[in-house]
């Protein structure tokens, strides 16, 4: 019986450095960033869109909606086909580098209805971690960790055989954190042009 996914060609990146590198590449290729500019509403026009912001209006022929947790807000301003995004909070446990190399790849359990499950992996700096959990939450800004969820993660880490062949040393946990990801109610990534 299969209990985990193996992706031999998978890799690990630093999400912060990757985002900076992508931004630098975009800038070198002509993208003009509008920092500290908040879009308050979008109007559909005959030839495109008008984006109303705190720094004035912008006209454009196309919009790429990459608003993450708030993608539904902007989508629903211009489309009759409404969507709803739920914030799905994930919590992580990070271990000290002294935990060492438990294995040389990311291990992911078989996906369930709440997502890919709690993975075991490394950062590019060599810290081992487990997570994320998956809890649907109302507060899209709420990035606090919870004792109940962290206790469940610790229980998994201390058990023999959850993604590793031996229990993980809980005295080597150095931090925990949480993040939220966008989950569309129909369980789909939406990568397409609006139909209307």
Enumerate the language-model features and the residues they cover:
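A short, glycine/Asx- and small/polar-enriched loop/turn
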Residues: 1, 43-50, 100, 183-187
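Glycine/charged-rich beta-loop-alpha catalytic/anionic-binding loops adjacent to active sites
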Residues: 2-4, 195-196
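Helical element adjacent to the flavin cofactor pocket in flavoenzyme catalytic cores
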Residues: 5-62
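Active-site substrate-recognition segment that forms the wall
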Residues: 57, 67-196
């Amino acid at each position: 019986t299969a209990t985990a996914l193996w992706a031999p060609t998978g890799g690990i990146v630093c999400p912060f450095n990757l985002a900076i590198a992508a931004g630098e590449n975009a800038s070198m290729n002509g993208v003009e960033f509008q920092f500290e500019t908040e879009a308050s509403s979008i109007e559909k026009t005959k030839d495109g869109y008008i984006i109303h912001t705190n720094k004035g209006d912008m006209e454009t022929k196309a919009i790429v909606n990459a608003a993450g947790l708030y993608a539904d807000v902007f989508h629903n301003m211009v489309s009759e086909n409404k969507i709803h995004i739920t914030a799905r909070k994930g919590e992580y446990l990070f271990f000290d580098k002294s935990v060492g190399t438990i294995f040389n790849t990311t291990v992911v359990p078989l996906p369930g209805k709440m997502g890919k499950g709690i993975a075991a992996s490394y950062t590019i700096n060599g810290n081992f971690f487990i997570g994320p959990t998956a809890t649907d939450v109302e507060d899209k800004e709420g990035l606090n960790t919870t004792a109940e969820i962290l206790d469940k993660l610790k229980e998994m880490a201390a058990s023999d055989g959850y993604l590793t062949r031996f229990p993980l040393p809980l005295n080597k946990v150095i931090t925990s954190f949480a993040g939220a990801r966008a989950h569309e109610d129909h369980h789909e990534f939406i990568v397409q042009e609006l139909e209307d």
